[in-house]
Amino acid sequence: MEKITSFTIDHIKLQPGLYVSRKDHIGAETVTTFDLRLTKPNDEPVMNTAEVHTIEHLAATYLRNEPNWREKVVYFGPMGCRTGFYLLLAGDYSSREVLPLVTACFRFIRDYRDAVPGASPKDCGNYLDMNLSMANYWGAKYVGVLENADETRLNYPE
């Protein structure tokens, strides 16, 4: 079998950033998959499931309520390696074009202090696995990366 695209990225050189992972064409529509990399793979500790789960709930809620992007959001969810998240948007976009959206989303996560949306037994299959304070921490850490993002944090390393 061929190696999938995400396994061809040099994870030794990869830094936290916002990257275009792939672009898929479905009929006339393009779907852009973004790699929201919060930790340096194989170097920094990965995120625990509780904060990953909390970030997932907060980001999905924010993105699906953001007036300019809500109709373009296909999916937001965690990477299995727990070093980041994937954001899928309907449309052909660059990292630079979605940088304001992703930055605003993670500022929301950084500053959020209320009950986590969907964190109830009726709404979620694992509602107790949440950690808002660590989600706030990771939100702040990633905002720092995004606010200072240059091309090395917006394009995969060669």
What are these regions (language model features)?
Residues 22, 37, 64, 70, ...:
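Arginine residue identity/basic-tract feature
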Residues 41, 45-97:
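M16/MPP (pitrilysin/insulinase) zinc-metallopeptidase core fold and M16-derived inactive scaffolds
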Residues 1-63:
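His/Glu-rich zincin catalytic helix
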